[in-house]
Amino acid sequence: MNLEIYLTGKVKTKFILEGVEQYLKWIRPYHKIKITSFPLAGSTSANRDQIKKKEGERYLKALQNEKNVVVLHERGEELSSMEFATFIKKWQNSGTRKLIFIIGGPLGFSDNVLSQNWKKLSLSRMTFTHEMALLVLLEQLYRAETINRGMIYHY
């Protein structure tokens, strides 16, 4: 199954970049994976609703023909690592060829994104930067793969 991750904002922090590269290296034997970054739509001191709307329009345009989209959102469903592994396995077993995850910018997602009929998951009740959310997601994707394959990584 192909995985795609869309996020608002570039990853600039060195240790996170290194972690992202490491997890991509570990995931790639099992999945083709692509990460796409959209630029921020403005500074957070500008009109927040306009920024969220503009960023939301980018997602909707890029994903207009996609059905298998997972929005990472603070009010999404929380899953344990074992439950997330099952979630991924169900997508794989259903014949899904591509699963897309989206990570919002500092202001989150606009209502036009949240109103889509897309699955919403939360990485935690805590809030993360887009960089940290990407790293946590990649770690959980790798962990899910090791769980589903019976590999020693998850205890």
Curated annotation (Swiss-Prot):
Family annotation (Gene3D superfamilies): 3.40.1280.10
Catalytic activities: pseudouridine(1915) in 23S rRNA + S-adenosyl-L-methionine = N(3)-methylpseudouridine(1915) in 23S rRNA + S-adenosyl-L-homocysteine + H(+)
Name of the encoding gene: rlmH
Entry keywords, A to Z: Cytoplasm, Methyltransferase, rRNA processing, S-adenosyl-L-methionine, Transferase
Record-given protein name: Ribosomal RNA large subunit methyltransferase H
Family: Belongs to the RNA methyltransferase RlmH family.
Function: Specifically methylates the pseudouridine at position 1915 (m3Psi1915) in 23S rRNA.
Claim: Nucleotide-binding is one of the keywords in the record: no
Entry binding sites for S-adenosyl-L-methionine: 72, 104, 123-128
Quaternary assembly: Homodimer.
Localization per Swiss-Prot or TrEMBL: Cytoplasm
Entry-linked HAMAP family: 23SrRNA_methyltr_H
Main location: cytoplasm
Entry's EC annotation: 2.1.1.177
PANTHER family given in the database record: METHYLTRANSFERASE, RIBOSOMAL RNA LARGE SUBUNIT METHYLTRANSFERASE H
GO molecular function: rRNA (pseudouridine-N3-)-methyltransferase activity
GO cellular component, one term: cytoplasm
Enzyme class: transferase
